[in-house]
Amino acid sequence: MLGSYFANLPHLYVHAAGLRALSTSAQLRTKAPSARKLIKMVTESSLSKKELESGTPIETQVGKGHEEVPEWKKQKLALHKKLNGEHWNPKKKLSRDQQDAVRMLKQRYPDMTNSNLADYFKVSAESIRRILKAKWQPNEDEMLEMQERWKRRGTRIKEELRESGAIPERRIRIASDGNAFRVRSVETPGEKSSKGISTPLQKNLHRLLRNTRK
């Protein structure tokens, strides 16, 4: 009996070593998911092509009524439908100063709608909604970097306008007096500032602020 036991010891050692190797590999696979699992995780958190191209209601696209639709999938489908299948990339983007002006006007005049602000800043109401919804605020270093970037952008645009011979837009300075706003001056680069000039943009601004106070 003992002779057969000792004779089988090498096989038992090999079997135990194999089990340890299997358990170690299983732990490694548990700690570091494979590329296939990572791709599967990303796919499960994204919308499929069939879901994006389907014209059926959102509630029937996932689970077919047998399970609840995840909230993230509802939001993605609704946004995809709202943008007509295109990515959010507006042609006109407001500068940081203009975005701050949008927030300031909305804070001071809560009754002012996104459509009113969109008409004045010549952007879509969706752009205004996203600006008001955003909570991110740049720190001091990021603000300096953005200012330098916009300064370089302004220099580049001036050079392009000078080369093409186009007339740059007029610069309008707005001053606040309590809860009222007024156009302080209208300047054209290369000319002296002119105060008290009634321009279409000035009239639109006063009309916009007057309508919000009603």
UniProtKB/Swiss-Prot annotation:
It comes from the Eukaryota. Residues 1-30 form a transit peptide. InterPro entries: NGRN/Rrg9 (IPR010487). Residues 204-214 have a biased composition (Basic residues). The keyword Mitochondrion applies. The keyword Ribonucleoprotein does not apply. Residues 184-214 are annotated as: Disordered. GO terms for cellular component: mitochondrion; nucleus. It is found in: Mitochondrion. Its main location: mitochondrion. Keywords: Mitochondrion, Transit peptide. Required for respiratory activity and maintenance and expression of the mitochondrial genome. PANTHER family: NEUGRIN. Belongs to the RRG9 family. This is Required for respiratory growth protein 9, mitochondrial. It comes from Eremothecium gossypii (strain ATCC 10895 / CBS 109.51 / FGSC 9923 / NRRL Y-1056) (Yeast).
